[in-house]
UniProtKB/Swiss-Prot annotation:
Belongs to the NAD-dependent DNA ligase family. LigA subfamily. It comes from the Bacteria. Residues 586-663 form the BRCT domain. It is an enzyme of class 6 (ligase). This is DNA ligase. The active site is at 111 (n6-amp-lysine intermediate). Pfam families: BRCT, DNA_ligase_aden, DNA_ligase_OB, DNA_ligase_ZBD, HHH_2. Its EC number is 6.5.1.2. NAD(+) binds at residues 31-35, 80-81, 109, 132, 167, 283, 307. The gene is ligA. DNA ligase that catalyzes the formation of phosphodiester linkages between 5'-phosphoryl and 3'-hydroxyl groups in double-stranded DNA using NAD as a coenzyme and as the energy source for the reaction. It is essential for DNA replication and repair of damaged DNA. GO terms for molecular function: DNA ligase (NAD+) activity; metal ion binding. HAMAP family: DNA_ligase_A.
Amino acid sequence: MDIKKRIDELRKIIEYHNDKYYNQDDPEITDYEYDKLYVELRNLENSHPEYKIQSSPTQKVGGTVKRELRKVKHDIPVVSLQDVFSKEEVYSFVEKITSEVTYPKFVVEKKIDGLTVVLRYYNGELKEAITRGDGSIGESVFENILQVKSIPKHIPSKLNYLEIRGEIYMTNENFIKVNEKQEEIGGKIFKNPRNLAAGTIRQLDTSIVKDRNLDIFIFNLEISEGKKFETHSETLEWLSNQGFDVSPNFKICETADEVWNAILDIEESRWDLGYSIDGAVVKVDNLNDRISLGMTSKVPKWTVAFKYPPEQKETVIEDIIVQVSRTGRLNPLALLRPVILANTTISKATLHNQDFIDSKDIRIGDTVIIQKAGDIIPEIIRSIPEKRPDWAKKYIIPDVCPVCNSKTIREPDGVDTRCSNPDCEAQSFRKIGYFVSKDAMNIVGFGQNTVEALMKDGYIKKISDIYILKNYKDALIEKGIIGKEKSVNNLLNAIELSKDNDIDRLITGLGIRNVGKQSAKILAGNFKSMDELAGAAYEQLIELEDFGPTTVPDILEFFNSNAYIELIKKLKEAGVNTISKTLQKKIDNRFLGKTFVITGTLPTMKRDEAAEIIQSFGGKVSGSVSKRTSFVLAGEEAGSKLTKAQQLGISIITEEDLKDMIK
């Protein structure tokens, strides 16, 4: 093997994956696979120091600072940990520490799979939050951190300065909910909770952060001016008493055997935690011992991270089927011979699209390796060609829809295949279900089972049929397909009530690709009616906050379709409101052309309430401060947005000022 060539190759591969992981939040390989590449490079460099260079990935932290967020210098560099993968390496670490420190104790904690943040408190008040970035300079995410409920904004202790580190993460339950909503709007499906948590905390729109319910575990106290501690475990107890969620169920150990057993205990429980971990961290407990042990050029000598390999199993693809989504996307699904993986029975896994199937050479009958992405979603890692039976069949996504037999089309600039028939029964079922859902028209009692029953008996085939169900009241009661008379009356009353919804709910319910609740509210606040919105030009839409070159063409295509023109005509005939109540409520347009940014905690109003008031007078509410911002409405704990507004000379107003402005 050409050592120099392999080292150069590994550096390029690792730099590529560093960028995908740290800066794009879209890793292509598992942490375990990455760690193996990294260890190979590190070992080669150690064996051949003549090839070691300062710019190597082994000599620096992987990320760079995202351009859109304010840069903040770290008081203490945020460095990586030394990874270990075997029992022998763990014992070697403990023995080395024992040879340098008298009677050391070790703390073993779960290694949460999330995004590290540094929190700064001044006199008990949270004032700053910073991501790791490149280890020396991070990015301020203070406004977003305020949306994380498990982070105290005030603590009992009034230390002059407190700096702590924690891991932002998303529970498995919330991750599934977010992906379900993304599926409903035809948006991006996230690979795992870590990617989603990392991408969310870097959002420029705080409302998105609030909706996604992030959490945090605090794992280290860095600076505590005015208070001294002897051990790490003591700091965790103190932080817990201050209201922080600290690394859960950590163990204090004295021997290598105890440390190893603690690591095994964590591994055994990892599938029942409700959130993702990718290892266990072993730390020297005594803080003075940590100082004496010091660090290498890159990692602390007093700690290591033991990385668990992802649990993988072999199984067989017994068949491949296609499901049709609400937006018409054909989703190939592998039906697997059932296998127990991470304490659950796995019998299917998504194959995403034709490119995915082809790149992995996946065939019906293949034996495949599967694991859970982020410990949640089953994914096929690779097929095993040497175990392929002679009869194994290549799979091609059909050129006709499996539900309605209409022609399918491959998106010219994408990887998805879609059904060309907007009236496809599979699409109609999901479209109707989404239209009546809580996030859209909120028709109480109109669940998926009701949709299925009414479609099966031919009472509804498309969205507009919902509003003529009252014509079949007697038949519905007689047949009892959705319950007795009271149930029928309740449903019909709920349908009538929905006619009076504001148009943001109607826009949401239409299921336009890449348009969810937040986008629908912006549209309803900028167009006085559905007709005006349908006639909007590209130039008008692209100027709206958070509407980009991906979303706007989808909106234009939808409103120019014959299907929409027919649907809106029938909805109007049924009496469904198509006028923006948000704009109707305007007393005047005194804020027309003005852009407001709301930051901090207001004395009596919620931010959403303040935003509605501003919008009702013609103003626009933005999630970020720029030269185009007219006013910043600031409450308590106003952070980086207030600072930027002051630097730009933008007018700062209070809640009282806003009230005076609308008198």
